[in-house]
Amino acid sequence: MESRHILITGASSGIGLEAAQQLAAAGHRLTLPCRSQARADALGELLAKRQLQDQVSRPLGDLADLASVEQLAATLLEQGMPIDTLVLNAGLQYSGASEPRWSAQGFELTLAVNHLAHQALLQRLLPLLLASPQPRVVVTASEVHDPSTPGGRVGQPAGVGNLEGLRQGPGAAMVDGQTPFNAEKAYKDSKLCNLLMARALAASLAEQQHKMPVLTWSPGLVIPRGSGGFFRYSREHNPLGQTLFTLLARDLLRVSETPARAGALLAELAAGPVAQETGFSYRSNRLVGPGQLRFETREPSAEASNDALAEQLWQLSASLVGLQADQGLNHH
């Protein structure tokens, strides 16, 4: 396996951190944006302890602020090193909160970090991906995007309506512009947006005859033992509920994946062999029995498979983050 230059968002904790360590140990060159200097320093210390710091850069890039995303991309473009794999993995959830939180530009924070910042970064970095001989994009989604799955059925289902919230712009609490704020639905919607964005990207790349696989995946329910990772925001809001949920899911029912195993799946998607050399694909780590998960190619939800909706989302999101819809795509 030859060495790749891999950029991973959300690599300072959880699955992203696990994947980063495994990829660094395998000899890949990594760029791991961190939202603060404190985060970057902590990540540097952790990697140094494991002798993994040599091939890793940790630039500042706060996904909750589009100006910071723009600065990060500008720095990387200036350095000019091709990106072989772009992993859009950061995923914020603040379950249990009754009020929305807002990004620096006034967008609801879950959507801002999980979707808008990722599209902004992706479009700006496309020239560096297209400069790689074998580029790929990997997007971490979630089964909760699909109302027919066990996780997607709990609470309000994902659904972006006609994207009225994006048409309203900053200050809209939900993407559909209709439903009252619900933190869990906001997360599900953001994961649906991840899949729609990936689908729109794959369609545009095909139109421009660029060969680049767009690999989307769902890690399954990953529950770490400790305070880091995906559940850290939810734990602050509902500590007892989270503790009971964790005990049930991880220790009694064994329906959850370990961060190390989920990290290995992500590392494989980022640097392993690809089944197809271009186009959209979706794989899900699905529960087939207690303690047994199977990682397999699946179809995302009907809504996530709507090409017209994907194209609309791409165009609206591009304009919200201050880009032309074809920015980065018309690069030869």
Where are these regions (language model features)?
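Short alpha-helical oligomerization interface
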Residues: 96-112
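NAD(P)H-dependent oxidoreductase Rossmann-fold/reductase module
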Residues: 1-84, 91-93, 152, 174-332
